Amino acid sequence: MSFRREKFIEFGGPDGGNGGNGGSVIFVASSAVNTLLYFRYNQHIRAENGKAGSGKGKFGAAGRNRVVEVPVGTQLYDEDGNTLIADLNNIGQQYTVAAGGRGGIGNAQYKSSTNRAPTYFTYGTLGEEHCVLLKLKIVSDVGIIGMPNAGKSSLLSRCTASKTKVSDYPFTTLEPHLGVAYANGCELVLADIPGLIENASSGAGLGHKFLKHIERCVILLHLVDCSLPDIVSAYELVRQELKLHSQELTGKQEVVILNKCDLLSEGEVREKQKLLESSTKKEVITLSMGDELDSLIVFLHAQVKKAVVTEPSDTSFDPFLYVHYNKK
């Protein structure tokens, strides 16, 4: 509230300006970040308050918005973690988590023909305050799946510049890794999903943490270790866990590769290839350590372009998943 006070002006009248609107908290999907680690140490995010109005009819400045970059694939849930609020799938997509309050109204706005000197004003409204849960699902063209020690990390490191850990023991990979492969003008994002074991759909071997990321992959690249005594059972075990987790996963297009063929003779490889093709009713590709991969990348790129992406349905909560992203 303010009144005009100047020399030789006896009845200056009201001149209190309006207050500025408060800033909003906005989340924006960005390729510049790939983890939610920022929120581990910044759990309370505030935008700037609007400035107060002043005399001479001056309006207060609006508060600046607080824009927070989040990885592409971030999902926002309500406080209970049951209701999906927003799904930021595309670069630049944004969502206003909490809108700023409206600025107050100065007494100059209440001047009328019957009230030439109003002594009242209106306070501004409070901004919104929300508690949201964040979950990150990796988004990739190809999800590399299979049992532990099937050679998934080795394939990713050969196709891309990914620095994933590669060793000859199960569960070498304990978190998803992304890599970008290039061949003959084709660009492909591959995700190394940690190995799936029996009862993964029930949470065994951190199954829930891994299976949910497969939902965002366009197609699946299923690696089967050629050296296993029963390759059909190994294949069917992984497929069963996908089915138990979500029927949508079983509908995704799948490319089957018989890996580590250099460990067996050509005759043994051919026999196992026919056995797996007979069981899966799909064409099975054989792969050895020394094989060139450009043709495989081009083939996968073509399959991705033809595939239909299914919408995810998972609503579990994993706030601080760390995703490694490597670009060749």
From Swiss-Prot:
InterPro entries: G_OBG, GTP-bd, GTP-bd_Obg/CgtA, GTP1-OBG_CS, GTP1_OBG_dom, GTP1_OBG_dom_sf, OBG_GTPase, P-loop_NTPase
Recorded superkingdom: Bacteria
Residue stretches making up the Obg domain: 1-139
EC class of the enzyme, as a word: hydrolase
EC id: 3.6.5.-
Residues where GTP binds: 146-153, 171-175, 192-195, 259-262, 290-292
Keyword 4Fe-4S carried by entry: no
Function per UniProt: An essential GTPase which binds GTP, GDP and possibly (p)ppGpp with moderate affinity, with high nucleotide exchange rates and a fairly low GTP hydrolysis rate. Plays a role in control of the cell cycle, stress response, ribosome biogenesis and in those bacteria that undergo differentiation, in morphogenesis control.
Family: Belongs to the TRAFAC class OBG-HflX-like GTPase superfamily. OBG GTPase family.
Name of this protein: GTPase Obg 2
Organism for this UniProt entry: Anaplasma marginale (strain Florida)
Recorded name of the encoding gene: obg2
